Amino acid sequence: MQQQAISEIQAAETLDALQAVKTKYVGKSGLVTRELGSLGKLPPEERKARGAEINTVRQAIDAALTEREGVLKRAALDARLASEAIDVTLPGLPLPAGGLHPINRVYEDLTGIYERMGYAVIEGPEVEDEHHNFEALNVPWYHPARDLQDTFWLEDGRLLRTHTSPMQIRYMVDHEPPLKIVVRGKVYRYEATDATHEAMFHQLEGLVVGDGISMADLKGTIAEMARGLYGPSAKVRFQPSYYPFVEPGADFAVWWDNPRGESKWLELGGCGMVHPNVFRAVDDLREAQGKPRIYEGKTGFAFGLGPERIAMLKYGIPDIRYFYANDPRVIGQFRGELG
């Protein structure tokens, strides 16, 4: 029996075949198991010798099973590794290259320019209260910007900020002049969506406050931004305009030599000298917090512009809605230009 069992074990080519041999000989109803079960029928004087003989056979079969199982498992592992082998000399799969979204790239360009001029870059809450968004910025209750049709109002009386200017108020309340900041973030307007308008868009806004700050300082700052964004040949044009939180106010445009042709004036944003009423509102808020009134008598300028407009003009994007379509076929076109 021992020789027959070992022969069948060595002939097994798979683990399933080996298991069948194991069941045949040492399973619950196997040949060796039955021999052990029949020992009780033997006379006592034969039982011990026969039991030792059967145990020797059992041990030999178990040893052969263990050895053959190891051989078959190693063979199976080798076969699997061979089938899954990777030729490391083959070229790898190309990884899709990412790139900055056009708006993010314009943001990075703008904030980089102002950081080099010593500005701190800050952000603020997108949900604002009416006072910080309007009243403190010299926008009284009867101003058209307070119309319910132009603003996203929340049930608790708060609103989605319509510009990044409220952060100027918050920053001045918490900090003393002199100061130089740019505020970046999303703003919201309740208006119809078309190729040039979205209900949500981005702004970058700057504020400088100190002693003796003049319109000449503002013009120099805008000119430096234009040169940093469009090159050393960029020229800046200012035209009078009205904004309730600055006086005097102006719109500014940049002459851009477009490498695609069609060089033209690009209207980028608005600016002006901070209105005295804004400083007065800041001091009122500071006084309510037990802080000294320090802004009345100071001078400063503010400016604001939209990254979407800059990106649309610079990269020839015809529809603002493309920025938010999340279509990689659209955004991927600008990967090379945007770095």
From Swiss-Prot:
It catalyses: tRNA(Phe) + L-phenylalanine + ATP = L-phenylalanyl-tRNA(Phe) + AMP + diphosphate + H(+). GO terms for biological process: phenylalanyl-tRNA aminoacylation. Binds 2 magnesium ions per tetramer. Gene3D superfamilies: Bira Bifunctional Protein, Domain 2. The keyword ATP-binding applies. The keyword Cell division does not apply. Mg(2+) binds at E247. Keywords: Aminoacyl-tRNA synthetase, ATP-binding, Cytoplasm, Ligase, Magnesium, Metal-binding, Nucleotide-binding, Protein biosynthesis. Its EC number is 6.1.1.20. One of its GO terms (cellular component) is cytoplasm. GO terms for molecular function: ATP binding; magnesium ion binding; phenylalanine-tRNA ligase activity; tRNA binding. InterPro entries: aa-tRNA-synth_II, aa-tRNA-synth_II/BPL/LPL, Phe-tRNA-synth_IIc_asu, Phe-tRNA_ligase_II_N, Phe_tRNA_ligase_alpha1_bac, Phenylalanyl-tRNA_Synthase, tRNA-bd_arm. Its cofactor is Mg(2+). Belongs to the class-II aminoacyl-tRNA synthetase family. Phe-tRNA synthetase alpha subunit type 1 subfamily. This is Phenylalanine--tRNA ligase alpha subunit.
